[in-house]
């Protein structure tokens, strides 16, 4: 099937769009004449405006009042309508730019915008109206990927590991491998030499750094990690942050974007605060090794963190292993999650499992998602 994946992550930067070909089990990988892996398909991006981002930040704050998942307090209804409309625009622009029509697309995987994720309370909410998006575009849409897993006692995250394994196999990787996605929250997929999966959120990703830079420097993120590189981490504060019980809890486990706050480093300078938060992300990742059945031979890094030179330097130092940005092996650092939700949509369409005991802690493999037809 030709499927489009849509991802709007907790970093609140914009909408990633990616087209792949998948049957739900395997992913079509193209190679160049030199054997190098080529793009899985075309990609696109629709940046959020400052106004969009401000509305979504308000939605995140006001989502704290949600008691049941259908609640839309404060600006949540407006934000949901905005998210749906912007995703429709993103797909329409993508189709036009690539000479495609809705008839060329079999399915869309629409993640939506997470505003609250508290699986311990049986609560996860991703705003965005899949049925409305399907009617507008004239294409079947799978959305609401996390709720069934959470309702069954799972963490509802991470969802991408089954795609990571399919992509690793299609790419010819053998042996133990770790795929680290550093978005707003960081998550890792550990693939053992025998193919067994273990996946979980390692800790904060870019969200705290982005919030810090927005507040202190009026910039949306720390470009290339240059601000962090100019500072010095506060070791005492880092030690205190890493005492949090989340880091010793056995996986599967997951985090909400707001589980930690950038204000914990409030007294520090802009540079030292960025350095401390960047080191916090990396050292939380290093703690993942405590749960690995075998040390990964290689770490492949995707998400915004793959474009942060200081974060990559620290990862290589603390992991003592080969650390490679996804782009360097022909994968897409920026669009890996969007590609994953295209693959997950096909799996859901075919009734295949998308979550597993070793990824979300759910009691048995289960499918998920809600399908809407135009």
Swiss-Prot record:
Top-rank EC class of the record's enzyme: transferase
Keyword set includes Cytoplasm: no
This enzyme's EC code(s): 2.7.1.170
Xref: InterPro entries: Anhydro_N_Ac-Mur_kinase (IPR005338), ATPase_NBD (IPR043129)
Keywords: ATP-binding, Carbohydrate metabolism, Kinase, Nucleotide-binding, Transferase
Protein origin, superkingdom: Bacteria
Regions crossing the membrane: none
Residue numbers binding ATP: 9-16
Keyword Transmembrane (UniProt): no
Gene3D superfamilies, A to Z: 3.30.420.40
Pathway(s) annotated for this protein in UniProt: Amino-sugar metabolism; 1,6-anhydro-N-acetylmuramate degradation; Cell wall biogenesis; peptidoglycan recycling
HAMAP family the UniProt entry points to: AnhMurNAc_kinase
Family: Belongs to the anhydro-N-acetylmuramic acid kinase family.
Protein's name in the database: Anhydro-N-acetylmuramic acid kinase
Source species: Methylobacterium nodulans (strain LMG 21967 / CNCM I-2342 / ORS 2060)
């Amino acid at each position: 099937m030709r499927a489009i994946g849509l991802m709007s992550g907790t970093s609140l930067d914009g909408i990633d769009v990616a087209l792949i070909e998948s049957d739900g089990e395997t992913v079509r990988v193209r190679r160049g004449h030199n054997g190098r892996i080529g793009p899985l398909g075309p990609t696109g991006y629709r940046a959020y405006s400052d106004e969009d981002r401000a509305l979504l930040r308000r939605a995140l704050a006001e989502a704290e009042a949600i008691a049941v998942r259908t609640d839309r307090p404060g600006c949540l209804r407006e934000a949901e309508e905005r998210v749906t409309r912007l995703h429709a625009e993103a797909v329409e622009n993508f189709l036009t730019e690539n000479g495609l029509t809705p008839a060329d697309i079999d399915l869309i995987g629409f993640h939506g915008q997470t505003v609250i994720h508290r699986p311990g309370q049986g609560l996860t909410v991703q705003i965005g109206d899949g049925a409305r998006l399907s009617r507008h575009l004239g294409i079947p849409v799978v959305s609401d990927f996390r709720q069934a897993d959470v309702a069954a006692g799972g963490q509802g995250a991470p969802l991408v590991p089954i795609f990571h394994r399919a992509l690793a196999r299609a790419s010819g990787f053998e042996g133990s491998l770790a795929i680290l996605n550093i978005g707003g929250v960081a998550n890792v997929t550990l693939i053992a030499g025998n193919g067994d999966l273990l996946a979980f959120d390692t800790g904060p990703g870019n969200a705290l750094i982005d919030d810090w830079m927005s507040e202190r420097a009026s910039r949306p993120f720390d470009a290339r990690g240059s601000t962090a590189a100019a500072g010095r981490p506060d070791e005492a504060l880092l030690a205190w942050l890493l005492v949090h019980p989340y880091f010793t809890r056995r996986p599967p486990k997951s985090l909400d974007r707001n589980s930690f706050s950038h204000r914990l480093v409030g007294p520090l300078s802009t540079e030292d605060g960025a350095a401390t938060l960047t080191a916090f992300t990396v050292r939380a990742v290093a703690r993942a090794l405590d749960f690995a059945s075998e040390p990964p031979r290689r770490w492949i890094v995707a998400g915004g963190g793959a474009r942060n030179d200081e974060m990559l330097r620290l990862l290589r130092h603390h992991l003592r292993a080969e650390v490679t940005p996804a782009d360097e092996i022909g994968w897409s650092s920026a669009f890996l999650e969007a590609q994953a939700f295209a693959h997950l949509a096909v799996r859901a369409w075919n009734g295949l499992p998308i979550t597993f005991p070793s990824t979300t802690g759910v009691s048995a493999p289960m499918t998920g998602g809600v399908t809407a037809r135009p």
